[in-house]
Amino acid sequence: MHLKASSILALLVIGANAYPASANSAAALVPEPQQPEAPAVAGSTVGAQVDIHHPRLEARYGRDEPQIMCGYCGKRFWNKPDLEKHIKLKPSKGGHKGQPYKEHSWNRPT
């Protein structure tokens, strides 16, 4: 499609006049900011506090040492499953297999 320069100029003038002057201003072209709406989900955590004392989150919030301690040897762990795995290992692998389970606790040091 070949248009002459006068036809292109006419289309530009018509296009510019199609909108009111206020719509051509920069302020009218910028959309207004909108606040995001909170999700209406029953299990939503919006506004809920995070339990920073959870063993997996303690390092993230400033505690750089594991807090769950083996009551038998004093070795510290980040979570209870790691402690239980440690207890079930043979002594040559760093565990306490064969020791009474009562002697092992997951008390947090004070």
Curated annotation (Swiss-Prot):
PROSITE patterns: ZINC_FINGER_C2H2_2 (PS50157)
Outcome of gene disruption: Does not affect vegetative growth, conidiation, conidial germination, nor appressorium formation, but leads to significantly reduced virulence to rice.
Induction cue: Expressed during multiple stages of host plant infection, including prepenetration, early biotrophy, late biotrophy, transition and necrotrophy.
Coiled-coil region(s): none
Zinc finger intervals, C2H2-type: 68-96
Subcellular location(s) of the protein: Secreted; Host nucleus
Biological processes per GO annotation: effector-mediated suppression of host innate immune response
Chain segments carrying region Disordered: 88-110
Assigned keywords, A-Z: Host nucleus, Metal-binding, Repressor, Secreted, Signal, Transcription, Transcription regulation, Virulence, Zinc, Zinc-finger
One Gene Ontology MF term: RNA polymerase II core promoter sequence-specific DNA binding
A single GO cellular-component term on record: hyphal membrane
Biased composition (Basic and acidic residues): 100-110
Signal peptide positions (record): 1-18
Transcription regulation among keywords: yes
Function description: Secreted effector that translocates into the nuclei of host cells to reprogram the expression of immunity-associated genes by binding to effector binding elements (EBEs) in rice. Binds the 5'-CCACCTCC-3' EBE of promoters from targeted rice genes and probably recruits a yet to be determined host repressor. Causes ambivalent immunity with increased susceptibility to the hemibiotrophic pathogens Magnaporthe oryzae and Xanthomonas oryzae pv. oryzae, but enhances resistance to Cochliobolus miyabeanus, a necrotrophic pathogen.
Name of this protein: Host transcription reprogramming factor 2
